[in-house]
């Protein structure tokens, strides 16, 4: 990027404005820039935008700051919420851990049962069990420090006595000791943690410790050891019964344990879940160490001794193997918990829960796709109501793009007061109005082209008077060309085929007084509507020629409508007044009925009775033309590049493409670069209507030029450029646009069209390649041929152009199965031999009537014939003869016409047709006959119908194919 410049898209982001807003504001301030985000602007333009839109920048910055503050607030709230959740989680974990600890403390407190009478400890001597010393040491390590010290002292005193063998203990005392030890062991396994599993072992050895010296340390032992209930597991027997149900109460909590770890010794039997079975052991097994939980053979990845093994509670955090799950007291829910629970319930009911994030993602994705498809459909529907057109679009192309019958488009234009034809081009304003009538919007794509053509503004001192441009219009054979022949002192009619004008002519005439007039001669045939419309658009004054011995004809009315649409003055020339049956007053009366009151009758329209053959009234007519021109005060600037309109174009075999143009402003010179439509070139030569070479042509001058690369379309505007590159660039762009337009106009066959053709049954197409000598004639023929199309036969003009018939045209006709029509042209080169080889039909015409009539006849020949019924005779039933295995025979008398054996018949009863069929047999007496005439009787048997009755009428008829005519 060069210093001092900046791209406008960066400025737009800085000031928070749109590109259109910036471009419009700069345009108002006198700075015209391209509407492109990558356009570079200078510091001066930047300052202009800064002065205007600094407020928008401030608003954007303020909005950004507010957005940043909101983002920070949201982030702080999110962090605070996460901290609260984390803190709450820690509190819950701590509370759960405390509950577990409290539960353990409560369970161990169950040992403090004060209902056991210890007075019997002096009666029964203690039984010393070997191995108590080692187990006692293990207990010392698991107890608290204070308890450990106390029990160590006791063990020192008791140990010598423990070594003494005591064998006189009764056998019955063995069972209570074993019973109490096992019971205590079960309790410890259920409620204690894993390190406390061995606590039950030394309890057996503590009993003799307490009973060994009751008199020496009676009080201290009671203080320290009564709360531990070390006497419960002693071997002494007091004779009292201990209620074990108080120790079995917590077992109810174990019932929900499904698949988890079971208490030691429970095994895999489901019957042991509720109550443990007591198994008495032998004396030799009394000292056996109880099985430690977890020592069973357990397979990997299973749930221990639990049934099923599918759920392993050991994976839970805080789980202690061998201990019961903690009893967590029910906590009263807080208000926040209640709100969260209600919110989760509502979300589940509304389908917004978090039970499946994947399902929610898929649902949101479906909604997004559905919304996107709906938006695309709406855009497509909106786009279908918008048509993109260029300045070259015609009425037929517009009708095709809107998919509207062309007759409706032409009718709409006529209702707006615009007389148009199928191939006539519409200006932007008219096109917008017409499309709006059908609910379409028009988008023009050629605005950038007009900006490249420099328009020179005319100053008052540069304007000079120019000659008027006069167009002569009227019905065919009313004398338009004869009028110009008399004025120009020439004989144009002799050169026209069939004595009618088929080309638009442009002539310059200099009168005796030195004044000049430019005349345009338009054809009067109905096919040349477009030519008349072009003549009216470029003219200053219109002369409507009406034959005094004729009437106001359709083309006369059309010419008047064209002149009115172009808003040009009208002069009526009533011709052929020299004839005996001429009646000019009748013509004026008809004009008055059309709201055209001539001056002779007190109106504002000028009229003149003339005779183009004898010259009657010609001088007065020219004077009225000059008077009208003087009133109009026509001026133009000759000191600028020429602009004007293409009147006609044709291909001259020796000179190339020749274009007849009418200069409306400026001056055209040999050597100038010209652009007309999509064609461009350098002017090589200029000639007037008489073939004289000229070097320059000023305003209101009709001239023929050579040098264009192709034949421009009649009606195109032309411009003169000083630089060939500029003209070539615009021509290339227009060619591209016209190609795009042709593709846009193409319509492929639709399903509805296929259905319509199938419904018709006999749908046919006629493809035509049309070549002519001049563009105006080609356009007129194209219009006329297209109007001949019917619902059953469609005319497709697949190609039309100016020039000779070439081999390319023949190959195109062969590929598309088309016929070639040449109007005043012949095949070039080997085109004729190729057409004979490919069996392509080439038709040549020089009169437009003949071409249209031949095509109409060809279309009528393509039409399927129409079947009509002709009644041949009537027969009355007089008698019936019923024959078995044959059927019913009707004895008839022919009352009208004749009945033929090949006829179809109808059976009519009480003026109602009850059957239609064929005749199987027609006999007269016993002979088979082909026909029976009126007045004779006969026997008739009808196929498949035996319900005939007397007095029925049999009507014989035949179907005849009749050639159809185009409507």
Curated annotation (Swiss-Prot):
UniProt feature, compositional bias: Low complexity: 256-272
Keyword field contains Nucleotide-binding: yes
Domain tr-type G: 465-635
Keywords: Cytoplasm, GTP-binding, Initiation factor, Nucleotide-binding, Protein biosynthesis
Biased composition (Basic residues): 354-363
Residue span of region G2: 499-503
InterPro entries membership: EF-G-like_DII (IPR053905), IF2_II (IPR044145), IF2_N (IPR006847), P-loop_NTPase (IPR027417), Small_GTP-bd (IPR005225), T_Tr_GTP-bd_dom (IPR000795), TF_IF2_bacterial-like (IPR000178), TIF_IF2 (IPR015760)
Residue ranges, compositional bias (Polar residues): 233-248
Alphabetized Gene3D superfamilies for the sequence: P-loop containing nucleotide triphosphate hydrolases, Translation factors, Translation initiation factor IF- 2, domain 3
Record's GO cellular component terms: cytoplasm
Chain segments carrying region Disordered: 201-320, 349-382
Signal in keyword set: no
Stretch list, region G5: 611-613
Residues binding GTP, per UniProt: 474-481, 521-525, 575-578
Described purpose of this protein according to its UniProt entry: One of the essential components for the initiation of protein synthesis. Protects formylmethionyl-tRNA from spontaneous hydrolysis and promotes its binding to the 30S ribosomal subunits. Also involved in the hydrolysis of GTP during the formation of the 70S ribosomal complex.
Family: Belongs to the TRAFAC class translation factor GTPase superfamily. Classic translation factor GTPase family. IF-2 subfamily.
Protein name (record): Translation initiation factor IF-2
Organism: Flavobacterium psychrophilum (strain ATCC 49511 / DSM 21280 / CIP 103535 / JIP02/86)
